[in-house]
Amino acid sequence: MSPKTETKASVGFKAGVKDYRLTYYTPEYQTKDTDILAAFRVTPQPGVPPEEAGAAVAAESSTGTWTTVWTDGLTSLDRYKGRCYDIEPVPGEESQFIAYVAYPLDLFEEGSVTNLFTSIVGNVFGFKALRALRLEDLRIPPAYSKTFQGPPHGIQVERDKLNKYGRPLLGCTIKPKLGLSAKNYGRAVYECLRGGLDFTKDDENVNSQPFMRWRDRFVFCAEAIYKAQAETGEIKGHYLNATAGTCEEMMKRAIFARELGVPIVMHDYLTGGFTANTSLAHYCRDNGLLLHIHRAMHAVIDRQRNHGMHFRVLAKALRMSGGDHIHAGTVVGKLEGERDVTLGFVDLLRDDFIEKDRSRGIYFTQDWVSMPGVLPVASGGIHVWHMPALTEIFGDDSVLQFGGGTLGHPWGNAPGAVANRVALEACVQARNEGRDLAREGNEVIREASKWSPELAAACEIWKEIKFEFDTIDYL
């Protein structure tokens, strides 16, 4: 028997408990191109050395358990075990460390985000030796990412389908999110699309409630889309939320949306689950539907900076599981989002190759090879005065989504949509002329409002609205 294949069974089994670091802390290890790499923010319990804590994370998220077991001798642990290969202190924190763990590719089922997360974060977060644990980033090697379909269509194909280029897309979430009848809901959709928006949207918790069953909503929204398209000459869409209590029901709703001829459906990928999301993404590619993704429940997982999982990991997982849009915060609105960190995971969603950049929270260089990109959606507490900043921060390949910032217009829904479209077109034109939107944005909006009474009214109603709270997620 060669040394490489020698097992404990061949040299004698020794029962008992030993430190994780004796087996799973390997600072001499050279990572492979095919390894999945993880960066964990580790807060050990008092008295637990960082090497032991990092090794425990590697062990409990791969092949290890609390004691030596006889069946270790029936396989090659060196081939399959996770390895903590580096540990570094977190600046400014006395008892916090970044532990880097490498996982062999063979630990994971191909094309399954469900299995990936079950292995890496499924059990170890309750480990008693740790006070807190946060997964900050993952490096997904091309050898693994190529086993996923990824987004149903991607950014370029979506633009070609919509015939819309050179600017961000405009959306609106219909409000109130709950309580409208299907017909009144469809009326609001029509008014917003007629006013100049590209998309309207079901809110994340609009599924099939007693006041508005899903089939009725789908029919009235489809009618609104076709009427608005006929009047404006532009392709329009409404994110019909297919999220349901079972995968079978979800697929039934997606199939009905396709039969109506609408361009896009929607899914709540965290509450719905990665298995359901991947199934829906495959259906959408096969049937020409775009897929909008809402991240409902994400803050339960990602908001605490010491424990949980950073959204950049959830964003990478979504790109593999499949989605053409995903909500990504705003930096400037009512929801959490620090600028450099937000732009870091926005690049991870859109770009093919993203260099390691710790200043933006990117721990590993990520190469997506040929996987299509995902459009980030800026949504939450934004209005026309935010348009210059949003255009400058997110660029053309994004969706800017104004719910209350459309439907809260003093003159109604269609004028609210007009105001947003005029503001966007003015900002894009100013940018293309070389003006600095960061410094001149308010002046650009004021100039445009002279020619648009709808925009002028919106500017007046929201001129004092600000959401000024410090972010709690920082590097």
UniProtKB/Swiss-Prot annotation:
One of its GO terms (biological process) is reductive pentose-phosphate cycle. The modification N6,N6,N6-trimethyllysine is found at residue 14. Transmembrane segments: none annotated. GO terms for molecular function: magnesium ion binding; monooxygenase activity; ribulose-bisphosphate carboxylase activity. Substrate binds at residues 123, 173, 177, 295, 327, 379. The keyword Lyase applies. CDD domains: RuBisCO_large_I (cd08212). It comes from the Eukaryota. It catalyses: 2 (2R)-3-phosphoglycerate + 2 H(+) = D-ribulose 1,5-bisphosphate + CO2 + H2O; D-ribulose 1,5-bisphosphate + O2 = 2-phosphoglycolate + (2R)-3-phosphoglycerate + 2 H(+). Pfam families: RuBisCO_large, RuBisCO_large_N. InterPro entries: RuBisCO, RuBisCo_large_chain_AS, RuBisCO_lsu_C, RuBisCO_lsu_C_sf, RuBisCO_lsu_fd_N, RuBisCO_lsu_N_sf, RuBisCO_lsuI. The modification N-acetylproline is found at residue 3. It is found in: Plastid, Chloroplast. Its EC number is 4.1.1.39. The active site is at residues 175, 294. Its main location: plastid. SUPFAM superfamilies: RuBisCo, C-terminal domain, RuBisCO, large subunit, small (N-terminal) domain. Binds 1 Mg(2+) ion per subunit. Belongs to the RuBisCO large chain family. Type I subfamily. This is Ribulose bisphosphate carboxylase large chain. It comes from Pseudolarix amabilis. The lineage of its organism: Eukaryota, Viridiplantae, Streptophyta, Embryophyta, Tracheophyta. The gene is rbcL.
